[in-house]
Design a protein with these regions (language model features):
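A structural signal for short secondary-structure junctions
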Residues: 26, 217-220, 276-280, 287-290, ...
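Active-site-proximal substrate-binding groove within the catalytic cores of carbohydrate-active enzymes
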Residues: 97-250
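Short alpha-helical segments and helix-capping/turn motifs at coil-helix boundaries
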Residues: 10-11, 16-20, 209-212, 280-283
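Catalytic-core region of carbohydrate-active enzymes that cleave or remodel glycosidic bonds
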Residues: 1-140, 144-148, 152, 157-159
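Short conserved micro-motifs at the rims of enzyme active sites and ligand-binding pockets
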Residues: 12, 44-45, 236-239, 307-308
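C-terminal beta-strand-rich structural cap/linker in extracellular carbohydrate-active enzymes
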Residues: 315-336
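Proteolytic-maturation and junctional protease-sensitive modules
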Residues: 281-320
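Proteolytic processing hotspots in large secreted/extracellular or virion-associated proteins
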Residues: 226-230, 241, 246-290
Length: 336
């Protein structure tokens, strides 16, 4: 899978790598490529330089760590069931010549009866002419992809659109727990970890990931990495509605709330200036642990800076993070 991105100035682009990795792992893909790492000479600009920047986007870079741990380390199981549809050469030619398929919408399973939500639940594949049929697979008619909660057949990833305008992606695997989307005001009890996101600039939208960096699982670990981030932009960058040109927001450290807008946006190629501003989203985490643990804020190089207070409630160690700590990531470690 190549050339994937949620381009800036998309206000929700902190989700980019996580969304790709979760479903790439579920589909058991061989490789994924974000577009693009950085194609300009100003490699240390300290600001997002264009729509597709990865290397100067703090949250896209930080979330490459849980992305790697999930996808490359194989921390999430591929979907159990495989749904296939056969596409022969003549049918492919007809789809293209009729204009039904085109450069940015090449022939895919949607033309052959596979429901758009099926890949959120099962593995899917096209069987092209000359390819053998898998010994065990389901046809599109054999499966039902009904929502509003699209949970994978492994139970490790779910896309919840119970509120169509406030979707949430949840990953719950042995070494990764992610809550991505409009998650504020809810409590996510994920067996050994409870995540309780709070309100954000984007009306409760944010990214919270917890990854086992040292250890086998959330029952047996020595070190965790927590990322809690949201809106990412450049200082002074103005976001406008694409059609009307109406200003939605001007980025600054004084920004308190953003208009909830579900339409095309643009910065009119005015990318503001350094430094990039990143929202550290507030959340409370409850981690089940039999030993004492400590939590630290991290600087931009990953070094410990400030200790975060932890309280004890039954089997849980509890702490809260947020914008007051002026960081997007934290280390949680078992006390030696």
């Amino acid at each position: 899978m190549s050339e994937y991105d949620h381009p800036a100035p998309n206000m929700y682009d902190a989700e980019t790598a996580l969304t790709l990795a979760a479903y790439a792992a579920l589909q058991d893909w061989d490789g994924i490529f974000l577009f693009d790492y950085g194609s300009r000479d100003s490699w240390d600009s300290k600001q997002i330089r264009g729509c597709f920047d990865i290397d100067q986007h703090p949250v896209k870079m930080a979330t490459m760590i849980p992305t790697y741990m999930l996808f490359v380390n194989g921390d999430m199981n591929p979907a159990t069931e495989l749904v296939t549809a056969r596409l022969d050469t003549q049918e492919e030619k007809e789809l293209i010549s009729s204009g039904k398929a085109r450069a940015w919408n090449l022939p895919d399973g949607g033309y052959l009866g596979i429901h758009p939500a099926t890949p959120l639940i099962h593995r899917t594949a096209l069987i092209v002419e000359g390819s053998p049929e898998p010994s065990q697979s389901l046809s599109p008619q054999d499966v039902s992809a009904t929502g509003p909660v699209y949970e994978a057949d492994t139970n490790e990833v779910a896309w919840d659109v119970s509120d169509r305008n406030r979707g949430v992606l949840v990953v719950n695997s042995s070494r990764n727990i992610w809550v991505v989307g409009f998650s504020s005001g809810r409590s996510y009890d994920l067996t050994n970890v409870v995540v309780e996101p709070e309100d954000t600039l984007l009306h409760g939208w944010g990214v919270v990931t917890l990854t086992v960096m040292e250890g086998k699982s959330f029952q047996d670990w020595n070190k965790l990495l927590l990322i809690a981030a949201g809106y990412t932009t450049n200082d002074g960058m103005m976001i406008r509605q694409y059609e009307s040109g109406k200003a939605i927001a001007v980025a600054s450290t004084d920004l308190k709330e953003l208009e909830l807008y579900n339409g095309g946006i643009t910065c009119s190629n005015n990318w503001g200036e350094a430094p990039t501003l990143v929202e550290g989203v507030p959340a409370t985490l409850k981690i089940k642990a039999s030993e004492d643990i400590e939590a630290w804020t991290l600087d931009n190089t990953g070094k410990r800076v400030e200790q975060v207070p932890i309280s004890v409630e039954g089997d849980y160690r509890i702490f809260s993070v947020g914008p007051g700590y002026r960081t997007i990531w934290y280390e949680i470690a078992v006390k030696e």
